[in-house]
């Protein structure tokens, strides 16, 4: 039967759901559909045909982890949540560590799942029709993800589906931002309802909070009067305006240093002399301070390894200063305030600039000496980092020379999506990210995030560049083989190929997981595992998969060849490299293949 002869689909709860997403500013929906979605499928087709330019873009994702990670990556660039659609309890469970990542990483994502029909005998449209409808009914489906979500809800009637979506998005977009989850049964999704809309101006999130005047004065004076003030941050760079304000603060207070313990965003430019770089809460700078200012930071130090001196003054400003989702979190502070980072930094910079007493104090020659010493230390650190990269053509590859080569070979506009786990800190030292938004890390611990997140980041950048002809920014994913394997890489590679989302992927193949060995050595430095092989402690991936071949096969490009000759006919190109010379030659292809031709490329780096 021709499409024109088909009966026009009714306006249902499912259609109103997608309409609500679009009206709220959601432009993409990453889907993994199932038996709970007949009305959803009808709505998708109806929307595509009747209002193609005012309907979310529907992206098929063979694995749920791909779907939620793509939405996660998109939101980190755009600042706007996107939608994920999965089926019943099993699809919800398959979101797994992706929900953890969005929750811990403070990323807004709207998740929708169908529920099993609640009628058995065809009483209403959507009743049970298949065997699995008795097997997939969980006693409390929302409980699967409730402890990771800012809000969980259920659509019980189509008459208020848009209000339910609006309320969920208010939670997703209010600090601390994070995932929300809404579910609905088949019968409800099939319900016919009259069309309606909401005034979106009345469905806004909670606005940013500011510091009270006494807190501004206390923090500003403590920073200026301290001999070794230290700012420890983690998420503040998610707001791209914050790094510039932190620079202004560091320029006002010579000697102040800034340390990033989360690595999820560029919170402070590496090139600035105040930068202490990125470490996962373990750096000696926290021991060498008399005043610590914690700014949007979950884990500022490891209490058993590098706590600040007991005499240090500690102030904490955060959108969630009590870390309400972390039961054991005992970091002390002499003052805590719930406030927006950008607003708080603006207040502090303005106060210091306009306070006459502080201005006079900062004119003391001692401050100039502190600033000069800070610059000297930073220059020495940069020299030490540069010396770590051995770049002779025959040199084997490691995190230091890989990072150095990526920094010099790729455009300055490159956005790095990093999930290198044990190599991330070394990569940060070598890449030295300074442009806001140029470095994006998960900020959580659900490995495999970057496979989908890099695609979401690139999609968001492509949308931003759509009004700028000729602008084709590069996204470079750097991922360890353990993380790459952990989250259905074939699904992400297929999505990249189908929807032509070009990303340069660097897989660091060190033959397995290295982080568990590091963890064991911290607890049992002389234990049995310390002298055991990787196979004995079950962290080896040997014989190693051929990730270059996997990339080409998953993208439908044929078998991987592992050579260096380009194939313009294939959308995905996979290469294995072993030496500095190999990597240099491979990176020479990136400008033409990934940026200009907008095709995918995966480099498997043998460590």
Region spans (language model):
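Conserved short loop/turn motifs at secondary-structure junctions
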Residues: 234-239, 390-391, 480-482
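Thiamine diphosphate
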Residues: 52, 123-136, 252, 286-288, ...
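Phosphate/pyrophosphate-binding active-site segments
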Residues: 2-8, 159, 196, 217, ...
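N-terminal alpha/beta PP-like core and its mobile active-site loop of ThDP/TPP-dependent enzymes
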Residues: 2-353, 409, 474, 493, ...
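A generic secondary-structure boundary signal that marks alpha-helix termini
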Residues: 49, 173, 357, 415, ...
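Active-site diphosphate/adenylate-binding microenvironment
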Residues: 14-18, 22-25, 32-44, 243, ...
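Generic structural marker for isolated residues within well-ordered, non-membrane alpha-helices
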Residues: 142, 246, 403, 547-548
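Conserved structured core elements
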Residues: 11, 15, 34, 213, ...
């Amino acid at each position: 039967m021709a499409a024109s002869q088909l009966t026009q689909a009714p306006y249902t709860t499912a259609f109103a759901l997608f309409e609500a997403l679009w009206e709220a500013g959601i432009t993409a929906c990453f889907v993994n559909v199932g038996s709970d979605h007949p009305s959803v499928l009808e709505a998708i087709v109806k929307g595509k045909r009747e209002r193609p330019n005012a309907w979310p873009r529907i992206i098929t994702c063979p694995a749920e982890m791909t779907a939620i990670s793509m939405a996660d990556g998109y939101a980190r660039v755009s600042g706007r949540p996107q939608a994920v659609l999965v089926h019943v309890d099993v699809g919800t469970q398959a979101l797994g560590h992706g929900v953890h990542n969005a929750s811990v990483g403070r990323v807004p994502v709207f998740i929708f799942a169908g529920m099993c029909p609640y009628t058995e005998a065809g009483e209403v449209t959507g009743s049970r029709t298949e065997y699995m409808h008795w097997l997939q009914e969980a006693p409390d489906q929302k409980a699967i993800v409730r402890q990771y979500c800012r809000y969980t809800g259920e659509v019980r009637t189509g008459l208020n589906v848009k209000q339910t979506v609006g309320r969920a998005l208010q939670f997703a977009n209010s600090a601390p931002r994070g995932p929300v989850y809404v579910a609905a049964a088949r019968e409800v999704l099939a319900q016919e309802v009259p069309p309606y809309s909401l005034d979106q101006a009345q469905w806004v999130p909670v606005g940013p909070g500011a510091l009270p005047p006494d807190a501004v004065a206390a923090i500003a004076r403590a920073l200026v009067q301290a001999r070794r003030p230290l700012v420890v941050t983690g998420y503040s760079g998610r707001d791209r305006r914050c790094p510039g304000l932190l620079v202004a603060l560091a320029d006002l207070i010579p000697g102040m240093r800034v340390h990033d313990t989360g690595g999820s965003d560029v919170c402070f430019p590496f090139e600035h002399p105040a930068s202490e770089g990125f470490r996962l809460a373990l750096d000696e700078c926290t021991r060498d301070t008399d005043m610590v200012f914690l700014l949007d930071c979950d884990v500022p130090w490891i209490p058993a390894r590098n706590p600040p001196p007991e005499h240090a003054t500690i102030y904490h400003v955060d959108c969630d200063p009590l870390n309400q989702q972390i039961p054991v979190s005992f970091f002390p502070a002499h003052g805590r305030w719930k406030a927006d980072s950008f607003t708080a930094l603006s207040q502090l910079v303005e106060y210091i600039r306009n306070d006459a007493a502080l201005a006079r104090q900062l004119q003391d020659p001692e401050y100039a000496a502190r600033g000069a010493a800070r610059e000297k230390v930073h220059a020495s650190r940069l020299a030490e980092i540069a010396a770590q990269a051995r770049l002779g053509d025959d040199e084997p590859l490691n995190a230091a020379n890989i990072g150095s080569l990526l920094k010099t070979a790729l455009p300055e506009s490159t956005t790095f999506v990093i999930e290198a786990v044990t190599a991330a800190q070394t990569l940060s030292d070598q890449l030295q990210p300074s442009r806001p938004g140029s470095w994006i890390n998960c900020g959580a611990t659900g490995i495999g995030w970057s496979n989908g997140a890099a695609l979401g980041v690139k999609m968001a950048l492509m949308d931003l560049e759509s009004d700028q002809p000729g602008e084709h920014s590069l996204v470079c994913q750097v991922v360890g083989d353990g993380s790459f394997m952990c989250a259905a890489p074939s699904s992400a590679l297929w999505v990249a190929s189908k929807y032509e989302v070009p990303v340069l992927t660097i897989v660091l193949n060190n033959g397995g997981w290295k982080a568990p060995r590091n963890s064991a050595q911290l607890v049992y430095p002389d234990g049995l595992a310390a002298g055991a092989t990787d196979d004995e402690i079950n962290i080896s991936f040997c014989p190693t998969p051929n990730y270059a071949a996997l990339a080409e096969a998953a993208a439908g490009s044929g078998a991987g060849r592992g050579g260096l000759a380009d194939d313009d006919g294939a959308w995905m190109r996979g290469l294995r490299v072993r030496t500095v010379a190999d990597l240099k030659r491979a990176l020479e292809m990136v400008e033409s293949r990934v940026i200009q031709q907008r095709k995918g490329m995966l480099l498997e780096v043998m460590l």
